[in-house]
């Protein structure tokens, strides 16, 4: 394999990663959410959503209503949580929310940051769930939970790119 073929393969791989990044950022701008697509990581929302379901979010500064399924992040942690709005009220110009997983016995007050009694719709919500694809995100869970699977997939992607003759 000559240098021109190697450079072409490298550029093809860079093109794939760049395209994925541009699509991700474009979705973020369109949906006004830093994470427009999330994967359900636990069974707390069963039977509505199963572990491994992919959720598509929308966050165009809409107020959440009781019964809406929202994704939020707790201050200081980067793990998105998918739960249903149990209660909402307004405090001056802020919408405050209390959430609960459908499969959980109690509300999420114990999950929130210390001294936090409600979620702030503007600062804590990642988005509201608008659509989902069942089980397609299970690969993400495998990659996250299994180091060997993660490196195996990465290795296969690199090898397949290097062995391609185009």
Curated annotation (Swiss-Prot):
It is an enzyme of class 3 (hydrolase). The gene is SEC11. Component of the signal peptidase complex (SPC) composed of a catalytic subunit SEC11 and three accessory subunits SPC1, SPC2 and SPC3. The complex induces a local thinning of the ER membrane which is used to measure the length of the signal peptide (SP) h-region of protein substrates. This ensures the selectivity of the complex towards h-regions shorter than 18-20 amino acids. SPC associates with the translocon complex. The C-terminal short (CTS) helix is essential for catalytic activity. It may be accommodated as a transmembrane helix in the thinned membrane environment of the complex, similarly to the signal peptide in the complex substrates. The chain crosses the membrane at residues 10-30. InterPro entries: LexA/Signal_pep-like_sf, Pept_S26A_signal_pept_1_Ser-AS, Peptidase_S24_S26A/B/C, Peptidase_S26, Peptidase_S26B. The keyword Transmembrane applies. This is Signal peptidase complex catalytic subunit SEC11. Residues 1-9 are cytoplasmic. It comes from Scheffersomyces stipitis (strain ATCC 58785 / CBS 6054 / NBRC 10063 / NRRL Y-11545). Gene3D superfamilies: Umud Fragment, subunit A. The active site is at residues 44, 83, 108. GO terms for molecular function: serine-type endopeptidase activity. Keywords: Endoplasmic reticulum, Hydrolase, Membrane, Protease, Signal-anchor, Transmembrane, Transmembrane helix. Its EC number is 3.4.21.89. The lineage of its organism: Eukaryota, Fungi, Dikarya, Ascomycota, Saccharomycotina. It is a single-pass type II membrane protein. PROSITE patterns: SPASE_I_1 (PS00501), SPASE_I_3 (PS00761). Its main location: endoplasmic reticulum. It is found in: Endoplasmic reticulum membrane. Pfam families: Peptidase_S24. Belongs to the peptidase S26B family.
């Amino acid at each position: 394999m000559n240098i021109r073929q190697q450079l072409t393969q490298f550029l093809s791989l860079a093109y794939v990663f760049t395209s994925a990044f541009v699509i991700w950022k474009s979705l973020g701008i369109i949906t006004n959410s830093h994470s427009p697509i999330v994967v359900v990581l636990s069974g707390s929302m069963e039977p509505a959503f199963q572990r491994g379901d992919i959720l598509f979010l929308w966050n165009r500064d809409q107020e959440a209503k009781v019964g809406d399924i929202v994704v939020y992040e707790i201050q200081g942690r980067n793990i998105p949580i998918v739960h249903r709005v149990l209660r909402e009220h307004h405090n001056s110009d802020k919408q405050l929310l209390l959430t609960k997983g459908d499969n959980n016995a109690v509300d999420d007050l114990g999950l929130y940051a210390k001294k936090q009694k409600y979620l702030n719709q503007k600062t804590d919500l990642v988005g509201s769930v608008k659509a989902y694809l069942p089980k397609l995100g299970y690969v993400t869970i495998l990659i996250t939970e299994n180091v060997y699977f993660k490196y195996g997939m990465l290795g296969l992607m690199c090898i397949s790119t290097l062995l391609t003759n185009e």
